[in-house]
Swiss-Prot record:
The lineage of its organism: Eukaryota, Fungi, Dikarya, Ascomycota, Pezizomycotina. Belongs to the peptidase S12 family. Keywords: Hydrolase. The keyword Hydrolase applies. InterPro entries: Bact_CellWall_Synth/Modif, Beta-lactam-related, Beta-lactam/transpept-like, Peptidase_S12_Pab87-rel_C. This is Unguisins hydrolase ungD'. One of its GO terms (molecular function) is hydrolase activity. PANTHER family: BETA-LACTAMASE-RELATED DOMAIN-CONTAINING PROTEIN, D-ALANYL-D-ALANINE-CARBOXYPEPTIDASE/ENDOPEPTIDASE AMPH. Pathway: Secondary metabolite biosynthesis. Hydrolase; part of the gene cluster that mediates the biosynthesis of the unguisins, gamma-aminobutyric acid (GABA)-containing fungal cyclic heptapeptides with the amino acid sequence cyclo-(D-Ala1-D-Val2-L-Leu3-beta-MePhe4-D-Ala5-D-Trp6-GABA7) for unguisin H and cyclo-(D-Ala1-D-Ala2-L-Leu3-beta-MePhe4-D-Ala5-D-Trp6-GABA7) for unguisin I. Within the pathway, the hydrolase ungD' catalyzes the hydrolysis between the D-tryptophan and GABA residues of unguisins H and I to produce the corresponding linear peptides. Disulfide bonds: none annotated. The keyword Hydrolase applies. Gene3D superfamilies: DD-peptidase/beta-lactamase superfamily (3.40.710.10).
Amino acid sequence: MISKTEDSGDPLDQDFAEVVKQTLDRWHIPGMSVAVVDGPDTWTKGYGLAQLPNTNVTPDTLFYTGSTTKAFTAAVLSLLVDDNKNYPQVQWNTPVNQLLRDDFVLSHEWDTNNITIEDILSHRTGMPRHEFAFGGDYDGHPASLRDIVRSVRYMQRSAPPRTTYQYSNLMFIVASYLIETLTGKWIGDVFREKIWRPLGMDSTYLSLEDARASGKELAQGYLYNSSLPGYEPVPLKNKPEVSGAGAAISNIKDYAKWATALLKRAPDVLSPAGYSAIWSARTVTPTHDPFITPSAYALAWNTQVYQGVEIVWHDGGIDGFGTEIALIPSLGFAVVTQANTTYSSNYAGTALVYHLIDKKLDVAPDKRFDWNKWYEDLERQMKEAVKNARQTFYPTVPSPAPPPTLPIGKYTGNYWHPAYRQLTILWDEERNLLYADRKDSTTPCQLTFIPVSREFFLVRLTVVGAEAMLPAEFRLGPDGTPSMVGILWEPSLGDEKIWLKKEGDTHFKEMYGGIVDSTAGKKRVPDTIHPIDL
């Protein structure tokens, strides 16, 4: 679809097509769709391949849009805040616990009683990501929103509320559950009723089943493997537990409609107060070049000043896909990209978004920020961090280091934490390799345990498209066998590891006290869990 007035220049011209090709080649991305909204005009176009080897991307191609879903969640909550007839109890400053009661309990009593709707939507609850704590099996059934929300009580915060920006998918899962609890409806139906249908967004879905049932072309997500080289398909998965935090599937046409409605403040979607609320800054966020003023997070939107104009934006990344949406409200201008690789789609999308913004703002070519180089440097730093992990985490270990106390195969078993759930550690005897596979979690990952010294290990954490190295430690019980394992799964907690207790160990109650029953909600997690202080 290309719609424009006669005197409008097409920003998605042949010159831009060449820039897109170079960028996709640079980042090894099969395909991308792009939309530009400029006042009354909208342009959309597809580039490259939606599915290898020969299915082209078109403006109708569906992509997972990741965390850009959060904006729909905030928008719906703004409608409930406005609706004083049906939801008089729902205001931005309403404590979430007043609405969800025992389902929403945090590790500190003050937090439980005071964290508000506004707080959970602006990443200022004090709760870090805890990205590996949810999904998978919950007592024999797949994770529900309620399961995940109730598990939050067992997760430690890393800062006092309202002091620090900490991005949290978890809190948007809480927001999704809140919407379903208040409305009595599945959040996907609420999105469709309140936002998508009024805007004519008839190609936007919140489940893979619905997207497939539509009969519309769905892009395949990929992971580029430089060692082959080649592309590995990333399995398309339905992740209902991600919900309003990042489960949307849409195409570039529909996202152009969404961007247009936001720029025009369409009265058939949100109220004037609602539009103001979702874009009003709440939390100061880290900034970097080329931004020279403080950045902030509003309600599911980032706000920054660039070249003298305010940009409101958000990105979205999920296994095999990446989306960028950026709006300049003062100019009625927006750019959206959707592509089909993990991480690199966001790198390329950002570079192309700012290429078009720079053209709109007449920024001289020699004054434009090199986003491709910035992301290449970031990738290099992450690889260096993996390479240097042993020295970073264990700088004083002698060489040669003492071997593990036990044969590697003796560290296997089922380990458990009330929030992070079960971790089954296995031994590959042929390769003498200790590992765990959490492929069914919301963030699928594999952990490989590399011995460093005695019970101290490094864990190679592999997720789709990336890897990291984390310190880990086993603790031996009185009988000389492993009783628990600690992994630095949440870096925001500093040196505090997440401790998982080995199944069947009698020290379990001593470690977790009375918080084992996830349905009881009677005790909070200790501020820190140090079974043994070294």
